[in-house]
A protein has these predicted regions:
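Bacterial Sec-dependent N-terminal signal peptides
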Residues: 1-26
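Acidic (Asp/Glu) and glycine-rich low-complexity loops/linkers
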Residues: 20-34, 50-191, 197-203, 207-210, ...
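Structural recognition of beta-strand segments within beta-rich domains
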Residues: 32, 39-42, 188, 300-302
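Transmembrane beta-strand segments that form the barrel wall of outer-membrane beta-barrel proteins
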Residues: 192, 211-212, 230, 265, ...
Length: 381
């Protein structure tokens, strides 16, 4: 009898595994050289970039269906428009999918379970005091992350309770789009409602213009880099060089940054370590600066309605704050500065370093209508 039961279980597991089907959308390869550029224009696509082991770019795009339904396959492929072409040294990838294929909000749990989890998430979020984080801790967060904080909360919950039944999400299919890219390739990206992940370090120029796209990078290293992101998620282990415009980006995690200019607005940004030649121009964002490199020298920030959070590492960093109409919270002690009679900016705060032996550099702030909090390093992740 036991042998019969085991046979049934074995047959069921085989049927489940074989119920998945893989349908090819696009499969192409092209030879490239140092002058080749890849132009990408995509909507509602999930793409994973990997480093190619030769000079060819390879594109492999499929849809994996969790159950074999002709009606579902027809509905999905009706919403896919994908083509790729090459003209001289330019490769153009154009994928315009319907919103039905979008995976930004796919949480892979039952709706009732999701309702409970999101309630717990917001309770814990309110309790979060954003303690100090090391650069290594932030890098681990980036590596673990699937996208939004809610995605990561559910992933962590599943890891903590592996045997708990959380049901299944509404999606009955997933996109699998892998692009193997030579390191010498220049890349331009225009994206909408997409997920784009790079699994290799980028040293060639990359230009990105995106709306509601979740980006995840390793190292981005080029002075010609240009990013213009509106909403979505932006996570990267390291930035060296480039210009970055971030507007309404509700999750930005940067392991370390140097030689870069950032123009930010109504975003939430966490940086593990700030290095040399970093300039910020911000409006109404929350900015968490956890650490400064030992040789960062000078950090410049101009802000209006900005909320800045620094973490006090005694006798390593000097700070000067010019402006007006700004509140300060230093080691839980509060002070505020009203505007001057003539409306001009003035020196609101100056923090000097007595011991120059451990001196990292100087922070220069120009801020109005802001909040600057220098938090004690009570806890460290």
């Amino acid at each position: 009898m036991k042998q019969f039961i085991y046979s049934i279980i074995f047959l069921i597991s085989i049927n489940i595994s074989f119920s998945q089907t893989k349908e090819l959308v696009l499969k192409k390869s092209f030879e490239t050289n140092d002058l080749t550029t890849l132009n990408i224009d995509v909507d509602n696509v999930t793409i994973q970039f990997k480093e190619s082991d030769d000079s060819k770019i390879r594109l492999d795009y499929s849809i994996i269906f969790k159950n074999n339904s002709d009606e579902l396959i027809y509905k999905v492929f009706k919403g896919i428009k994908a083509k790729v072409s090459k003209n001289k040294n330019v490769i153009n990838l154009d994928v315009k999918n319907s919103m039905y294929l979008g995976e930004l909000h796919n949480l892979d749990v039952d709706i009732n379970v999701y309702t409970e989890l999101i309630s717990d998430y917001f309770k814990k979020y309110k309790e979060n005091k954003f303690p100090h984080k090391t650069k290594d801790f932030l890098l681990k967060e980036i590596d673990f992350s699937l996208g939004t904080d809610m995605h990561d909360y559910i992933k962590a919950f599943k890891k903590k309770y592996p045997n708990k039944n959380l049901g299944e999400g509404s999606k009955r299919f997933e996109q699998k789009f892998i692009i193997n890219v030579p390191k010498n390739l220049k890349i331009k990206i225009k994206s909408l409602h997409s997920r784009i992940t790079f699994n290799y370090n980028i040293n060639k120029p990359i230009k990105v213009s995106a709306f509601k796209t979740y980006f995840k990078f390793k190292k981005i290293n080029n002075n010609e880099n240009e990013f213009n992101l509106n909403m979505g998620v932006f996570q990267t282990d390291r930035i060296i060089g480039g210009n970055y415009i971030l507007k309404d980006v509700n999750k930005v995690l940067i392991g370390s940054i140097s030689n870069a200019k950032l123009s930010t607005e109504t975003s939430k940004i966490q940086i593990g370590e700030i290095g040399k030649d970093v300039e910020f121009n911000d409006f109404n964002s929350k900015l968490y600066f956890y650490n400064f490199n030992k040789n960062f020298e000078t950090f410049e920030l101009k802000g209006d309605y900005s909320k800045l959070y620094f973490y006090n590492k005694k006798n390593t960093v000097s700070l000067t704050a010019y402006g007006n109409t700004t509140a300060f919270v230093i080691d839980k002690q509060k002070a505020s500065f009203k505007p001057s009679k003539d409306g001009k900016k003035f020196k609101m705060l100056e923090k000097k370093v007595k011991n120059k032996e451990n001196y990292f550099g100087h922070i220069n702030l120009n801020i109005t209508h802001g909040i600057i909090e220098i938090k004690p390093q009570e806890k460290e992740h």
